[in-house]
């Protein structure tokens, strides 16, 4: 019975860690302070989806992905 309880606890911990979202995904959209126009994607924590935006090319934050697939893999 103790072994079964231990297995259950370990499984629960693994599920919690696997479902933990990367803190990058909670950062706001940041277009940057320059004036280029690069199409990028960010995770919108309000809508729970990755969305397109135009990145200025410098500054910003880590919630900035080159492809929709990359954004979804990290955050969705």
Curated annotation (Swiss-Prot):
It is found in: Secreted. It holds the Pfam family Kunitz_BPTI. One of its GO terms (molecular function) is toxin activity. One of its GO terms (cellular component) is extracellular space. Its main location: secreted. Keywords: Blood coagulation cascade inhibiting toxin, Disulfide bond, Hemostasis impairing toxin, Protease inhibitor, Secreted, Serine protease inhibitor, Signal, Toxin. The keyword Signal applies. Residues 25-75 form the BPTI/Kunitz inhibitor domain. Expressed in salivary glands. Residues 1-20 form the signal peptide. The keyword Disulfide bond applies. Disulfide bonds join 25-75, 34-58, 50-71. Potent anticoagulant protein that inhibits the hydrolytic activities of all serine proteases tested (trypsin, thrombin, elastase, and chymotrypsin), with the highest efficacy on thrombin. This is Tabkunin 1. It comes from Tabanus yao (Horsefly).
């Amino acid at each position: 019975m103790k072994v079964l309880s231990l297995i259950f606890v370990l499984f629960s911990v693994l599920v919690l860690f696997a479902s933990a979202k990367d803190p990058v995904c909670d950062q706001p959209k940041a277009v940057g302070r320059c004036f280029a126009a690069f199409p990028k994607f960010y995770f919108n924590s309000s809508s729970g989806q990755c969305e397109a935006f135009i990145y200025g090319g410098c500054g910003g934050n880590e919630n900035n992905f080159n492809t929709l697939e990359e954004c979804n893999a990290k955050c969705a």
